[in-house]
Amino acid sequence: MQRELNRFLHYLEVEKGYSQGTIKAYQIDIERGLIPFLNQRGKFGVEEVIRGDIRAYLGYLTVERGNSSVTRARKLAAIKSFFNYLVENEELEANPAASIKSPRIPEKEPVYLTEKECVRLLETMIHKAKPQVKERDMAIAVLLLHTGLRVSELTNLKLSNVDLKRGQIKITRKGNKEQYLHLNGEAVKALSSYLHSRPQAQNGKFFVGTKGQNLSRTYVYEVVRRYLRLAGINKDKHGPHLLRHIFCTRLHQKGVAAFVIKELAGHKSLNTTMRYIKIENKEQTEALNRLEFGI
């Protein structure tokens, strides 16, 4: 089964153009989760797997592992993709997971920062950041707030793809798709300040450590969490994705159309964008009031 998985992962990289982070997630879900479970049931070949095995695995994830519906849905999606690949590659006649419905995921109220909390976060960084990382950490926060970049897009941003004179950056989205993003005045100012203090580095990345090394995703998460904590901002979600969320929310609050937000955020589907946007009761009322005939 490992050989089939290796070919599948190669397919995701070469033909689908998935990021290394996404490919790694698929690998972990199947290699460390599904395959050991199947082996314990005496199943060692992909042709031996039946629908009951997949159902049993989902039950195991629920009862034994305590996985949430979100986690189980993600793992099932990875399993379906794996077996779909084998069917399309004529290595299997049918996908044993095809008819299994994804666990129902309860909708949650969106978590986002208010305008005042955004200001408080930035002011906290100005007053409490260490001098050697202050300009860089400020640039990271401002760029996340003003462009809504994913962490991987930020850490992979190349120095050569930052054009402060034109006020734009070129980033690589999911699926290795390139996109140019405009920078507003605050973002240009923050990136310029950081550029003046940026250490020499050979890796070509825009954001680097104090010794010129690559910045990890984990480090960026820790940076955002630290300053949120110092600012006294407590949210259920407290990582960089919270800043991506407020980017979409603020655009919506400023009257930007959903399809424009979709393009700026790099979402594949408008449904994804709508999950970031909280439609207030006041907005619903105002929208319906516009339908009155005035009689």
Where are these regions (language model features)?
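Conserved catalytic core of the tyrosine transesterase superfamily
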Residues: 1-295
